[in-house]
Structures are given as structure tokens and as C-alpha cells.
Amino acid sequence: MSIEKGKGRAMDIDLPLGSESTLPWVEKYRPANLEDVVSHKDIISTLEKFISSNRVPHMLFYGPPGTGKTSTILACARKIYGPNYRNQLMELNASDDRGIDAVREQIKNFASTRQIFASTFKMIILDEADAMTLAAQNALRRVIEKYTKNVRFCIICNYINKISPAIQSRCTRFRFQPLPPKEIEKTVDHVIQSEHCNIDPDAKMAVLRLSKGDMRKALNILQACHAAYDHIDVSAIYNCVGHPHPSDIDYFLKSIMNDEFVIAFNTISSIKQQKGLALQDILTCIFEALDELEIKPNAKIFILDQLATIEHRMSFGCSEKIQLSAMIASIKTGVDLAAKVN
């Protein structure tokens, strides 16, 4: 994302005049050029060489959300096709049908034709392709093989293991890592200045912590808080996103380790309900806080194993009350076991 004045504007995507002020900041500050894309310098350099030598292959972009995969390929399309890049581009995402019928009809029809007076290939972007069925992926493989002269595919996914090996072998793969906090901070600073956000330095650092390398998440948090509060402090950030405050986690751990089971359960349940916290977020924060907890290594090992089991159960939709009880019990048991060893 751009950090220079005048760059990082909303891309010209046929929006009504004056609509830029209503755009989500994720779109408003999406990089228009490859030079504006944050981080991933090696990937950008390789893509620029492909484009300059007119040897663009089929590509597979994979990595966590909010790391610039879609922004990068759209910037590539602008560089290849110029301002009218939308005429040469087909983009399908999670809101579209990506079953076998979509591959046989939409994708095949687009890939099998060429633009009149156009000397270059067209491009198809399949975003969140890891949601495609195996049958659709097999059909896509045949389309990729048959129409390489007409079209280049860019397949984007979060989990590469959900993409069939046959498609992987036909694409040049690029892994997009989570963005470093310093890179996200540059863009966040630019947005804060451009949007005149009244935000405390500690609150900005909270945004960076909560984003965890996800630029989209950072900008969405910032925009939500800017809309809800005239002055953004740390509490505003955590209240707006419904994430446990670090002081809450410290309080939870002290209660678990010092109070009786029933008191600890009632204390955590009350705060959890009052602030609308999710047990999954509490579990993740307690996992992160265990590093600073002064308990024996064998107790940490036991607790971590139990937390992993609880998280696994939660993925199946188990009762949060039961799993909260299990979390409290596992931490208490781990601490007691360490005390007995001594």
C-alpha cells in the first residue's frame, strides 16, 4: 500500500463520481501500481521481470489473508493492459459459483476467445480458489492446458494444500507472508494523516498487534473505530473489535490461579458476557500470555496440550460454557501438578 502523498488512491473501477469518500479504506488505499505494494519486494521484482520480458506464466499466489495477493495481481494487470485493463480481465471470487459448471461455462467461454486487435493474452483471476471443488479443479486443469495461448490464470488462495497438485505444477508459485508490523505501520500512519484520525500512539500500536500481519484487518479496525469514536484510545480499539484487552487476560489468569474454581468461572463468564468476548479469542490470548507466566515448564506443557484439545473441540461447535470450565480446570490442574513435583 502506498505511503506517499498522492499515491494509494482508489483504483478506477467505474465508481460513481464522489463515491470515493464512501469507499471502505481497504479499497480506497489499495495500491494502484506494483511500486506501491507493501513488502514482498522479491515477488514484485520477479513479476516485473516477467512483464517486461512478456513471459508471464500462470501464477499461484498463496498465503494468509490481507497480505496483498489480490492487490498485487490487479497492479500487474494495470501494468500489462493499461487503464482499460478491466476489458482484458475476468475476476471470480468467493461470492461467485466456482463449481464445475462455472469452469465449463464462464471460464471456458472467456478463455476460448481473443480480443479483436489485442496482441496480448487475457487474464483470469480466481480468488479464494481453495473453495473450489475437486471436480472443478480438474476441469480447470484442462482449461489451463487448452487455452494457454489466449489466457493466463492467477489462482489465489489461503491454503495451498487445498489446491490440487496438478494445478500447482502448472503454475509459478508465490508465497505471501504476513506483513511486518513496520510495513503496516507506514500505511496506517498515511491513512491516519489522510483521514485526520484522532488516535493515541498506544491505540495505533494496538491496531498493529491485533492485525497480526493482515493489512486488510488493520485498515478495517481503524475505519470502524474512526466511525465510532471522535477520539480513539486503546480501550476504544478493543471495545470496537470485541477483542479481550491485555489487562482482562491478566485479570483472568490471576483469578484462575488464586480463586476457587466457581469464583474464577463466574468472574470470567461475567466479564465475557459484559464485553461480548469470544472464548476463542480468550483462549488465544491466554496461550500468548503463558510465555510470561512464571510456572514450571512441565506445567506449561500440560496446559498447552489441554488448550489445544479445547480449541479442537470448539471447532466442532461445542458449548462455550463447558469449554470455559475445561480451560479453567486445565490451568488449575497444570499449576497444581507443578507444585506437587516441587
From Swiss-Prot:
Keywords: ATP-binding, DNA damage, DNA replication, Nucleotide-binding, Nucleus. ATP binds at G63, P64, P65, G66, T67, G68, K69, T70. InterPro entries: AAA+_ATPase (IPR003593), ATPase_AAA_core (IPR003959), DNA_pol3_clamp-load_cplx_C (IPR008921), DNA_Rep/Repair_Clamp_Loader (IPR050238), P-loop_NTPase (IPR027417), Rep_factorC_C (IPR013748), RFC_lid (IPR047854). Belongs to the activator 1 small subunits family. Heteropentamer of subunits rfc1, rfc2, rfc3, rfc4 and rfc5 that forms a complex (RFC) with PCNA in the presence of ATP. Two other complexes exist where rfc1 can be replaced by either ctf18 or elg1 to form the ctf18-RFC or the elg1-RFC complexes respectively. PANTHER family: REPLICATION FACTOR C / DNA POLYMERASE III GAMMA-TAU SUBUNIT (PTHR11669), REPLICATION FACTOR C SUBUNIT 5 (PTHR11669:SF9). This is Replication factor C subunit 3. It comes from Schizosaccharomyces pombe (strain 972 / ATCC 24843).
